[in-house]
Amino acid sequence: MFGHVFSRRTSFLVRCFHVAKKFSNPEPEDILFSALCLNLRQRRWNTLHQFSSSLTNPLISRVLREFRSSPKLALEFYNWVLRSNTVAKSENRFEASCVMIHLLVGSRRFDDALSIMANLMSVEGEKLSPLHVLSGLIRSYQACGSSPDVFDSLVRACTQNGDAQGAYEVIEQTRAEGFCVSVHALNNFMGCLLNVNEIDRFWKVYKEMDSLGYVENVNTFNLVIYSFCKESKLFEALSVFYRMLKCGVWPNVVSFNMMIDGACKTGDMRFALQLLGKMGMMSGNFVSPNAVTYNSVINGFCKAGRLDLAERIRGDMVKSGVDCNERTYGALVDAYGRAGSSDEALRLCDEMTSKGLVVNTVIYNSIVYWLFMEGDIEGAMSVLRDMNSKNMQIDRFTQAIVVRGLCRNGYVKEAVEFQRQISEKKLVEDIVCHNTLMHHFVRDKKLACADQILGSMLVQGLSLDAISFGTLIDGYLKEGKLERALEIYDGMIKMNKTSNLVIYNSIVNGLSKRGMAGAAEAVVNAMEIKDIVTYNTLLNESLKTGNVEEADDILSKMQKQDGEKSVSLVTFNIMINHLCKFGSYEKAKEVLKFMVERGVVPDSITYGTLITSFSKHRSQEKVVELHDYLILQGVTPHEHIYLSIVRPLLDRENGRP
């Protein structure tokens, strides 16, 4: 009886304790937290807006963690906070972002997590370093009950941004903090190294894998195969394939596609076909060709001009049940256009449409380009009109193809009008087409028109480059208008644009032709980088004016800059030409022997200059002797000079009429 009473009293006391707890004063943040959660569950955004000024990052993070089992709703809240809360838009946003990343990775919403990471590290976003993001993720790791997958995701975010160094730093720091990224993250990093052409670094990381406790998977082997194929080492790639089989790792279709594409790019179509035919046998009948496989082979044959074989592979592709796609048709359309069969290319486009495929901008560009190359202006413009009628958005390649095509065929006025329409509609903002128009106006000696193009570029706010200025500078220099050329150059410098070697060489050439050798040499001395064209220009002008001493000095400078490599065939031809003009024939012959000794092979210009000069001022025997010497050095004779000068001498020597 007493036990029963005691039990009831205990129960009563416990109930009293809970009631007391229930009616105790809760913390203000707890009240706000409960209100936020209640309204968030019912998506009452207008009501939530009333609390925005009271939000703190710890509170935001707490709400996000509360909804870890509802990641979609948590993400909606996170995005709402970013749009409406001033606190979260400051540097304090970072804490909530890290919590959100943990929740998204935990719920396998990797794309959303990667998007937040990319925004944190982008110039448009917070512009945080990968290591800064990593530190935030590590701080919130425990509270969010996260997994190492979050570090894999950060590595992937870096590699997607092309930041190989950032990915490396994350991997190293993660290891230093007692965590470890998976082999998938390491594969991502190594793939990024290959994409940015850091081949040596790729091999270094690959060789360290085993010592770090990683086991290669099929993706690792595929990367190694890709690396060898990238360097056209097909035999080594095949060796890796067989090593993969010995390790008990079965290949996938990517393994074969890497090798087949590598073979096609090196032109080894026989090897590509062998791999295509043996895919089943080499994979234990687990792998069969897909659209990528067939497209690689079709593209390879198209590049080789073997359209018959490309069509045969397309037939095999259809028979095997693999549908042709835009890439299949794109390769064939381009190949038929290159072969001058535009009608067949257009027929393929109709076939595409009948199969429900879209003729994309790339394919249209290809057709327009080859029609212009054939000189079929009306056909090209008709295809362009068809693009417009189908609301197909033209890109900068379309614009460049049309402008160049019209200019190339003499329709410069039409090209200007087309460019004007593009600029007015603001469809594409690209300086390449403006530069093309300037080039053609300069070539046609319409410098005032070229000036107008430059002016319109400035009005449109386009960022001019060295080609824009260089084209106009070269045009004015060729017309002998040195002062105007220098005005444009000064304008370029005032706009903080960097000159290049081509512009400097044009100015040096212009000054030299005006007899301003001193000024030309001063420009050369001020140039940080000089090339063979720079020196050849000075050398030519020095020899033209008979200043042999100055020419000798220039030749010495050339040799000092880069040894004998800097003295090219053009240099020797300039020297031989001027020595012959000054009557120094034996000296010219010495220069010839000097160039041969240094491994520079004479060409038909060398042959023509020497044979013509020797035929006028030396005996017939000397001419024939010189001809024989040049032939022995591997020179192909200048046809006209050989037939008109040397052949008659040889016939006379052999007693022929």
Curated annotation (Swiss-Prot):
The keyword Zinc does not apply. InterPro entries: Mito_RNA-Proc/Resp (IPR051240), Pentatricopeptide_rpt (IPR002885), TPR-like_helical_dom_sf (IPR011990). It is found in: Mitochondrion. The keyword Repeat applies. It holds the Pfam family PPR_2. GO terms for cellular component: mitochondrion. NCBIfam families: PPR. This is Pentatricopeptide repeat-containing protein At1g11710, mitochondrial. It comes from Arabidopsis thaliana. The lineage of its organism: Eukaryota, Viridiplantae, Streptophyta, Embryophyta, Tracheophyta.
